[in-house]
Amino acid sequence: MVINLCLPQFRPRIHCNKISADGYEVENLISEDLTKRSHGFRTEYFIKPPVYVTVSFPFNVEICRINIDLTAGGGQNVTGLEMYTSASSSRVSWNTPQCRTLGPAEPSVPDKEAFTLVGKVLLKNQSQVVFSHRGFKARPPFGAMEATLPSPAVVAQELWNKGALSLSHVAHLRICITHVTGGGIPCIKRLEVWGQPAKTCSQEVIDSILLVTSENLPQDVALQAPALPMESDCDPGDQPESQQAPSSLQKLAEIIQDVPEEFLDPITLEIMPCPMLLPSGKVIDQSTLEKCNRSEATWGRVPSDPFTGVAFTPHSQPLPHPSLKARIDHFLLQHSIPGCHLLGRAQTALAVIPSSIVLPSQKRKIEQAEHVPDSNFGVNASCFSATSPLVLPTTSEHTAKKMKATNEPSLTHMDCSTGPLSHEQKLSQSLEIALASTLGSMPSFTARLTRGQLQHLGTRGSNTSWRPGTGSEQPGSILGPECASCKRVFSPYFKKEPVYQLPCGHLLCRPCLGEKQRSLPMTCTACQRPVASQDVLRVHF
């Protein structure tokens, strides 16, 4: 049995010779807070190698293996590492009260000349390194270490034995980041030093270590050898919260292991709700790409590929990945992953947006409508009232889909003789609407309309009245929605006066509404239904 000497219960201390970024201090590597530990260590963006990270142990240790994860920068940044050890023990005993009061940022680090180079590695595309001691032998009461199979994604490097004290009597371990790629940031995501107390440690220190180990690890975890590449992923640490629900954490870990790697964002390691294909061939989530673009914008740089740094051009843009999105959705339907709700779709925007909230009278109408069938739509009014899409814009996705389907005009009101409108027809209708709304208030324009044309407009306005939740144009109407009283056409170009909607769905302009309010009781001109003044809503195009 070997122990992870970087766990906080063994009170290691750590120090870096360079400035760290906010929230990514070097103390995160040995922190008791699991959130801080997951952030890892990262220097400021202007720091260049070499960067020295020194870990000081409160007792001399014999190193078995050193695991280093270098993915804290979101990509492959670090390409060169060197390992140094020192046997100088300028510190107090581990189990003394004085050592218990020292903080993690107060290590007594020896001079540079006291360190011995024991390992070196150059990385190409890997981000995890394992330095192992071939001559390590476990001693009682520490059991024999089981053999572990190396992972192909991890670089395995042997430590060099530079003397009797270089690996078996270590007081300080120094990690030197020697090279980074391009403008990369020196970083360490995770650090683990596995070993056992040195032969020179007293029996009292060994007993204390065994006691701490047995108190902070479950029985089944304490008796098994760690697995590559990062053994502390399943260590519950010394927090009681993690000991209370080990089964849920283990279940979540098993589920995450079953997720295909292509479904995970390579930067955040989370399932991608909206995968985007980058010009470099990499696939990341849309939210991750937006965060990268915002980060670039803070430094005055244009949006670029996070992996290559090449700026986007009109001919080289990130594109959605629909086939991968379909596979991710299918996978989530087959597997239940906590916290993943990625199959929803955005609610479609309505053509009309109310400027008021639900009024008490409307709420009473909705409750009363539960027992009255709707003859126009052929469904129960208990599902949705005619004004429900306007007064409930923040309903759920399922409700919004039902409202959209319910408020569609029935087949008896639709002209099925014509096919879908072409672009030229839509453009022509848009020009007619703009022209009619502009000239509608001019007497010289309205005087040219004959009595038959006015009667036709009035009949069309009463038969094909504009309903909320539908588009700005009905199949039988060319000019669009209009005032039920004066027949003035409303459109996005109509900016002179506000528009109001009655509970029956018909629209009124401001002057006509004022006339209706002066003559009580107020009724709709088109359908002759009574209208309460508090039920009138102002709508916007």
Curated annotation (Swiss-Prot):
<protein>
    <recommendedName>
        <fullName>RING finger protein 37</fullName>
        <ecNumber>2.3.2.27</ecNumber>
    </recommendedName>
</protein>
<keyword id="KW-0479">Metal-binding</keyword>
<comment type="pathway">
    <text>Protein modification; protein ubiquitination.</text>
</comment>
<dbReference type="GO" id="GO:0005634">
    <property type="term" value="C:nucleus"/>
</dbReference>
<dbReference type="InterPro" id="IPR045696">
    <property type="entry name" value="Ubox5_N"/>
</dbReference>
<dbReference type="GO" id="GO:0008270">
    <property type="term" value="F:zinc ion binding"/>
</dbReference>
<dbReference type="InterPro" id="IPR001841">
    <property type="entry name" value="Znf_RING"/>
</dbReference>
<feature type="zinc finger region" description="RING-type">
    <location>
        <begin position="483"/>
        <end position="528"/>
    </location>
</feature>
<keyword id="KW-0539">Nucleus</keyword>
<keyword id="KW-0808">Transferase</keyword>
<comment type="subunit">
    <text>Interacts with UBE2L3. Interacts with VCP.</text>
</comment>
<feature type="domain" description="U-box">
    <location>
        <begin position="258"/>
        <end position="338"/>
    </location>
</feature>
<dbReference type="Pfam" id="PF19318">
    <property type="entry name" value="DUF5918"/>
</dbReference>
<keyword id="KW-0862">Zinc</keyword>
<keyword id="KW-0833">Ubl conjugation pathway</keyword>
<keyword id="KW-0488">Methylation</keyword>
<dbReference type="GO" id="GO:0005925">
    <property type="term" value="C:focal adhesion"/>
</dbReference>
<dbReference type="GO" id="GO:0000209">
    <property type="term" value="P:protein polyubiquitination"/>
</dbReference>
<dbReference type="Pfam" id="PF14634">
    <property type="entry name" value="zf-RING_5"/>
</dbReference>
<dbReference type="Pfam" id="PF04564">
    <property type="entry name" value="U-box"/>
</dbReference>
<dbReference type="GO" id="GO:0005654">
    <property type="term" value="C:nucleoplasm"/>
</dbReference>
<dbReference type="InterPro" id="IPR017907">
    <property type="entry name" value="Znf_RING_CS"/>
</dbReference>
<dbReference type="InterPro" id="IPR039847">
    <property type="entry name" value="Ubox5"/>
</dbReference>
<keyword id="KW-0863">Zinc-finger</keyword>
<dbReference type="GO" id="GO:0016604">
    <property type="term" value="C:nuclear body"/>
</dbReference>
<dbReference type="InterPro" id="IPR003613">
    <property type="entry name" value="Ubox_domain"/>
</dbReference>
<dbReference type="InterPro" id="IPR013083">
    <property type="entry name" value="Znf_RING/FYVE/PHD"/>
</dbReference>
<feature type="modified residue" description="Asymmetric dimethylarginine">
    <location>
        <position position="451"/>
    </location>
</feature>
<comment type="function">
    <text>May have a ubiquitin-protein ligase activity acting as an E3 ubiquitin-protein ligase or as a ubiquitin-ubiquitin ligase promoting elongation of ubiquitin chains on substrates.</text>
</comment>
<dbReference type="InterPro" id="IPR039925">
    <property type="entry name" value="RNF37_RING-Ubox"/>
</dbReference>
<dbReference type="GO" id="GO:0034450">
    <property type="term" value="F:ubiquitin-ubiquitin ligase activity"/>
</dbReference>
<dbReference type="GO" id="GO:0031625">
    <property type="term" value="F:ubiquitin protein ligase binding"/>
</dbReference>
